[in-house]
Amino acid sequence: MKVFESGQDWKIAALRNHFHVHFLFGDYMKKKYFDIVYEQANRAFNAGEIPVGCIIVKNNVVIARSHNKREKMNSVLGHAELLALQDASKLLGNWRLEGCDVYISLDPCPMCAAALSQARVRGIYCAVSSTNNDEKAIVNKIIPKKTKFLSDLDVERSSTLLKNFFKNKR
């Protein structure tokens, strides 16, 4: 499985000066990342899974991507975040994903938040926040203060996809 985005070779060469790359392309890249996350969430939706997509980025390069596969795998561990963490760890040869940022279509559940915390990711960026306030409070306690954690960064697309999924289930 190819995890790097095609056409990112120029970025890899430019990453020696990460500050300038982030300064020049930061907002543009975040939009591109959420486009990939949304694509992954759509894959889950089309497979009859809860539409959650996740990517992991290191040095502005997508190193892992996944979507929910609980039904397909018949496993509670088939969450998009856990699958992406496994792929990123395998690629980097290390379970510590320091310097990595995670982009998710929905706030992580407590189980995934704990895994992200253990992986020592630098930042967690979510398209839409969970509507479960109890779960949100638990997740906020799990994620370390040093980890950047932002939600509601791409609300319209992800919330519409989630609403359509659950509307079709009822």
Where are these regions (language model features)?
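Short beta-strand scaffold segments in enzyme catalytic cores
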Residues: 52-57
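Short hydrophobic alpha-helical segments enriched in small aliphatic residues
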Residues: 5, 19-23
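A short, polar/charged loop-to-alpha-helix boundary motif
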Residues: 72-82
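Zinc-dependent deaminase
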Residues: 26-47, 95, 108-170
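Short beta->alpha transition motifs characteristic of CBS
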Residues: 63-70
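Immediate flanking context of iron-sulfur cluster ligation sites
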Residues: 94-106
